[in-house]
Curated annotation (Swiss-Prot):
Membrane-side (Mitochondrial matrix) residue stretches: 30-62
Transit peptide: 1-29
Chain segments annotated as transmembrane: 63-83
Keyword vocabulary terms for this entry: Membrane, Mitochondrion, Mitochondrion inner membrane, Transit peptide, Transmembrane, Transmembrane helix
Broad class of where this protein is predominantly found: mitochondrion
Record Gene3D superfamilies: Cytochrome c oxidase, subunit VIa
UniProt cross-references to CDD domains, sorted A to Z: Cyt_c_Oxidase_VIa
Gene field: eat-5
GO cellular component terms listed in the entry, alphabetical order: mitochondrial inner membrane; respiratory chain complex IV
Subunit structure: Component of the cytochrome c oxidase (complex IV, CIV), a multisubunit enzyme composed of 11 subunits. The complex is composed of a catalytic core of 3 subunits Cox1, Cox2 and Cox3, encoded in the mitochondrial DNA, and 8 supernumerary subunits Cox4, Cox5a/Cox5, Cox6, Cox7, Cox8, Cox7a/Cox9, Cox6b/Cox12 and Cox6a/Cox13, which are encoded in the nuclear genome.
Protein's name in the database: Cytochrome c oxidase subunit 13, mitochondrial
Compartments, record wording: Mitochondrion inner membrane
Main function: Component of the cytochrome c oxidase, the last enzyme in the mitochondrial electron transport chain which drives oxidative phosphorylation. The respiratory chain contains 3 multisubunit complexes succinate dehydrogenase (complex II, CII), ubiquinol-cytochrome c oxidoreductase (cytochrome b-c1 complex, complex III, CIII) and cytochrome c oxidase (complex IV, CIV), that cooperate to transfer electrons derived from NADH and succinate to molecular oxygen, creating an electrochemical gradient over the inner membrane that drives transmembrane transport and the ATP synthase.
Record-linked InterPro entries: Cyt_c_oxidase_su6a (IPR001349), Cyt_c_oxidase_su6a_sf (IPR036418)
Length: 136
């Protein structure tokens, strides 16, 4: 136990001592050029990659800000026009004949707690069909 305490206090004393004085100026080796003209291939490649990344980022920023909103507006206008044409066409058609309702459709064991109790939460009168008088 005494040896463990001795090791602990030796480490503590080493940590509390003042740190070694370091040079404030970085040491330059004789082979390191001080000017920019002596860049090696790695540094030149890294700078080229950095420049390419900046240009590509700017390109996609411009596409996102100036290209996407008009494309979304055109697509939205097209969808709206097609939707209106579709329902305009359906309004001119004669009424549909009674649809066949199969035994596995619209099974109700009890009424829903909303509305008249027979329609689901997302019921759409112009699309969904339910014959209350069906015989199973």
């Amino acid at each position: 136990m005494f040896a463990q305490r001795q090791m602990f206090f030796a480490r503590l004393a080493a940590n509390l001592r003042a740190p070694a004085v370091r040079q404030t100026v970085q040491r330059r080796f004789a082979s390191t050029p001080a000017n920019e003209s002596g860049k090696n291939a790695f540094v030149r490649e890294r700078e080229a990659v950095k420049q390419h990344a900046a240009e590509t980022t700017e390109l996609w920023r411009k596409i996102s800000l100036y290209g996407i909103p008009p494309a979304l507006a055109l697509a939205g206008y097209n969808a709206y026009t097609l939707y209106n044409e579709h329902w305009e066409h359906w309004s001119h058609l004669p009424p549909l004949e009674e649809r066949t309702e199969y035994p596995y459709q619209n099974i109700r064991t009890r009424n829903y707690p909303w509305g008249d109790g027979d329609k689901t939460l997302f019921w759409n009168e112009s699309v969904n069909y339910h014959n209350r008088d069906k015989v199973t």
